[in-house]
């Protein structure tokens, strides 16, 4: 069962666990015309000269705006121009829906000028010829907000300038509410969170169905709403939208019987996370140039909110966080913005008959099921880590075995020295919160265990060999395990308990110890 260790620890206070998409942002691109060569081909097929591009493109824009807004005029819904692109559009749309009593259908169309990628024609000073260029410009964007019969409250936007790029925002919990209403499953809801569900198992089955819908069909319906003239504009050219996932949030909600049940353990969990996951008040870890492929930063922090405290760990563009919602719900949520650090078992892109191998996860919706698997595994590992909070096993008994030599592949491996500085630094490194998302590699540990970059290749090899020996020692003591088909490692449940206990012991003062034994 997912989150089994957490359930074993706190199951008597929990009414159910629900996992699935929260925020899901998809983008549609007309791949045939998002490049200069693609646009040149379209102009050639449309018999449009480069000198006439501006006038022709403006006509296309006016046609799109007129057609996109026609439904609002027909239904007497407002079309509102926003002077600032920074205006909270969701808040503005919800205010309109509340004032007008809208419970289904179109709420409003909000328009504003925003930066967008589009085309323009310029004269090349070297060749003295007109050439199309694809660059960042500012153009009118149309945001449609509506209450969908399938997805519930949602929005989608389309830029009015070529190549008419689209972004669709859906919330999995909002979608689930519609599904439960249709299937007569009772629930109590606060915002995008369910405080209780009459039949959690059935709700989870419904949420799992979200992964199996025909996304091209569902999204084509949205395209027709945003641009009813798409078929007419590109008739006979075979130009259609390619859909990718810009961002997804996979959330696991643990529903407690009472708010007081969660309140009794949540502060200790946050404290546990801040201390043993190396997180604190605006505590940051800069991971610049950890290895040749790493260009981002690694950070962990926590934030006080009016409703409670949120702890968050980031690794490059991806993150995992934990926070309390609606009083009685603990949510752990993995956010994926960059899928390239994750793997999926698939053939080579564009060659379905090639050998199936573990390859980088793609942005396309074809890999949406794997995104769910990665998010669930990440959340489960994080909840496993939280389950180690305040263990009742005596520390001496817990660490006794790791303080003895072990055997690994018929070779003797030394004992850990958990309170010696070198091994303590190693335990802190493998317990960093961001490694709950996708594990860690030899090179990740090198960046944490050495103060500066290696001076030469020989030093690089020596460091790699040293860390390999440390990894072998951790595996011999069953603290970590290898992720299949990768060079990554994750803490085992046993390792979580050991490492959390050792690191937590570093925070205990003599005064606190005296109170415990008094």
Residue ranges and their predicted role:
Residues 472-485:
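A short, conserved structural fragment
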Residues 487, 493-518:
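Short, amphipathic alpha-helical interaction segments positioned at domain boundaries
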Residues 436-459:
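Short acidic, hydrophobic short linear motifs in intrinsically disordered regions
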Residues 464-472:
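Short, hydrophobic-biased segments on the C-terminal half of alpha helices
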Residues 399-439:
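Short alpha-helical segments that sit at the start of domains
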Residues 1-254:
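Long, contiguous, compositionally biased segments that the model treats as domain-scale units
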Residues 141-400:
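Extended, non-transmembrane interaction/recognition domains
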